Amino acid sequence: MKDAGEVNLLLQLSQLEKQLLNSATERSADFVTSLLSPDFQEFGTSGLVYVRADIVDALADEPATTTSAEDLDLRVISSDAALLTYKSTKAVGGAASVRALRSSLSVRRDGEWRMLFHQGTRIA
């Protein structure tokens, strides 16, 4: 059972994650830059590796999407590190949905939570 601090952190990090998944928010370079750590790295569902600049640069070319997140779970690693895991379903236009298992490692720096690492693994 999670204590009140863990529940609040789960809500905070889940909200940020869901905002990042929202295609309208994704296109806000300022928001993404503020959420991702300068040394951010992602292993995408495509198998490609991205850094923060790649994510910000790709925003303008990203098609409109609808992505849902479910089964969110938080593991507190330390007072300044937490791992959020969940399942996502992404629909692009009328195309088939892409489902993935996702993990986001966030760290607290200067009192603010920033995503340091993210991995998406396609669900077959």
Question: What does each model-identified segment do?
Answer:
Residues 2-34, 39-124:
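A beta-strand edge to alpha-helix "cap/lid" segment located at domain peripheries
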